[in-house]
């Protein structure tokens, strides 16, 4: 089986999730790190903003991450994927196989994230979109399919300054 390709924007989010995990000194990269990284993605941020205040979601995610046990500073380590993150990826790959797409993208991962059971990230995202998954996913797909609206998929400006840890 060929390796899974990621779109550039998803690769950026993936790397940012790992960075957030390392900055928090967490042993495992979790869906919550991914959700925090997704909030830095302009189109995702704007879509969330049409349902609720993204800063509320951001604060709830980082409250969870702050309460998560961290690796002591004197210990060297490499973060690994949590079981939930592995399940998220597995579900996303299955979804990709059904839709016959060439590269994994943000919309695939978000769809799988919303379906993830026993996940704080799934719960918080669902709560912030008022559990209107179908409407949220339609808006998210529209946002990512609208290339003319935002040629840059990530930003460090707008009102995203609160996102940096």
Predicted regions: what is each one?
Residues 1-162:
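Histone-fold recognition with a strong bias for associated Lys/Arg-rich disordered tails
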